[in-house]
C-alpha cells in the first residue's frame, strides 16, 4: 500500500503542479470579440437588429461570433430563411469586423440543440442526413465571404449538456469532413468545455480549439447552489500549451462569462438574483482572470444582456466597461 502511494504521488503530483501551480505570461496583444444571438436578444424583449447595430457601432468589437439556429434557417424542410443572417454578416463586413459562423444542430444558447419542428420526429439516421444537407447549404452560401475567419461546427459536441436527442462523435467527424470538402481553406473551430475537458478530442479533429471560461455558475445538484470553479488562470494556459506542443493547434476562448448564470433563464430571473453571478465587480474580476490566463483571443458572452441592462434597466456600467475593453 505504501509503495502504491509513493508511485501515485510520483505520477500525480507533477501533473497537478503543471496544471494548477504558477503564472501564465500575459499577452501584450489581445483581440477581444463578442458572441451574438438574435434569439437571445428577442428573449430579452429587445429589438434584435437595433441591439446588433448598437453593438457593432458603439462597442466596435474587432471580431464577432454569430450564433445561428437550424430551426431559424430551415423552418420548413428545404425552405431556407437566410435574410436575417445575410443582414448580420453584411453589417459586420461593412464595418470590417471579422466573424466566426456557428452552424449545426447544437449551437450556442439554450436549449443548445435547435431542431426544426419538421425534423423532431425523424429517427437518428434521418436527422443526421438532414443536418448534413443543412450544413452543406449554409457552408456553400457563406464560404466566400472575406471576413469569415472560421467555421464553428456544432457547439461543445462532446459535452452532454442541453436538450439534445443524441450525441455521436462518429457523426461529428462526418460533419467536419463535409465542411473540409466544401471549404478546405477556412479553419474549422471545435469547441470544448474549459472546465471539464483537456481539449484533446477537439484538437485532434479541428484546425483550432475554442474553450469556455466560466467563473460563477448555478449547479442544479443537491437542491441547487452557486459555485465558483476553483481553477487558477494558469490552468487554461497550461492546457493550451499541451495542445500546441502535441497537436500544433491554437486555442482561443470563445465564451468568456460576462452575464449571469442562475437557476432559471436570465430573462425571467430577478435582478437581485442576477447580481449573485454577474455584476460590475464580478465582470472586472472575470476580465482580470482572463488576461492572467495568457490567451490572446477572447469572445465575451452576454453582450445582449449588457444592452438589456443598459436600455431596459438603466444600468449601463458593464456596457461602458466592455466598450473601453473592446475598442
Which role fits each region the language model picked out?
Residues 1-16:
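N-terminal Sec-pathway targeting helices
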Residues 17-62, 67:
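Boundary/entry segment of secreted carbohydrate-active catalytic domains
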Residues 32-36, 64-66, 99-103, 149-153, ...:
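Hydrophobic faces of well-ordered beta-strands that scaffold small-molecule active sites
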Residues 42-58, 130-141, 193-202, 279-289:
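Short, acidic/polar
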Residues 49-120, 163-190, 204:
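Aromatic-lined substrate-binding rim segments of carbohydrate-active enzymes
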Residues 106-110, 131-166, 299-300:
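Active-site groove signature of glycoside hydrolases
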Residues 149, 250-326:
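Substrate-binding cleft of secreted/luminal carbohydrate-active enzymes
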Residues 186-266, 316-322:
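Glycoside hydrolase catalytic-domain groove-lining segments
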Amino acid at each position: 500500500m505504501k509503495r502504491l502511494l509513493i508511485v501515485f504521488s510520483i505520477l500525480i503530483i507533477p501533473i497537478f503542479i503543471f496544471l494548477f501551480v504558477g503564472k501564465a505570461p500575459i499577452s501584450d496583444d489581445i483581440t477581444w470579440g463578442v458572441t451574438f444571438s438574435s434569439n437571445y436578444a428577442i428573449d430579452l424583449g429587445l429589438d434584435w437588429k437595433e441591439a446588433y447595430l448598437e453593438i457593432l457601432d458603439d462597442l466596435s468589437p474587432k471580431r464577432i461570433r454569430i450564433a445561428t439556429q437550424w430551426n431559424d434557417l430551415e423552418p420548413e424542410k428545404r425552405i431556407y430563411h437566410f435574410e436575417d443572417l445575410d443582414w448580420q454578416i453584411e453589417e459586420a463586413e461593412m464595418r470590417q469586423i471579422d466573424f466566426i459562423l456557428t452552424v449545426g444542430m447544437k449551437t450556442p444558447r439554450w436549449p443548445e440543440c435547435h431542431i426544426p419542428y419538421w425534423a423532431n420526429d425523424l429517427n437518428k439516421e434521418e436527422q443526421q442526413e438532414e443536418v448534413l444537407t443543412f450544413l452543406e447549404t449554409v457552408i456553400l452560401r457563406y464560404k466566400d465571404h472575406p471576413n469569415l475567419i472560421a467555421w464553428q461546427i456544432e457547439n461543445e459536441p462532446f459535452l452532454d449538456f442541453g436538450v439534445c436527442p443524441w450525441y455521436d462523435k462518429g457523426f461529428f467527424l462526418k460533419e467536419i469532413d463535409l465542411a473540409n470538402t466544401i471549404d478546405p481553406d477556412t479553419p474549422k473551430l471545435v469547441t470544448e468545455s474549459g472546465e471539464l475537458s483537456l481539449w484533446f478530442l477537439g484538437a485532434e479533429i479541428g484546425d483550432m480549439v475554442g474553450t469556455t471560461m466560466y467563473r460563477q455558475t448555478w449547479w442544479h445538484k443537491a437542491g441547487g447552489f452557486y459555485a465558483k470553479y476553483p481553477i487558477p488562470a494558469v490552468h487554461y494556459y497550461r492546457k493550451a500549451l499541451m495542445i500546441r506542443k502535441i497537436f500544433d493547434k491554437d486555442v482561443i476562448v470563445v465564451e468568456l462569462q460576462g452575464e449571469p448564470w442562475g437557476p432559471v433563464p436570465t430573462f425571467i430571473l430577478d435582478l437581485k438574483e442576477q447580481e449573485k453571478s454577474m455584476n460590475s465587480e464580478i465582470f472586472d474580476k472575470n476580465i482580470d482572470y482572463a488576461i492572467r490566463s495568457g490567451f490572446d483571443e477572447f469572445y465575451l458572452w452576454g453582450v445582449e444582456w449588457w444592452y438589456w441592462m443598459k436600455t431596459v434597466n438603466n444600468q449601463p456600467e458593464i456596457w461602458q466597461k466592455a466598450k473601453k475593453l473592446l475598442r
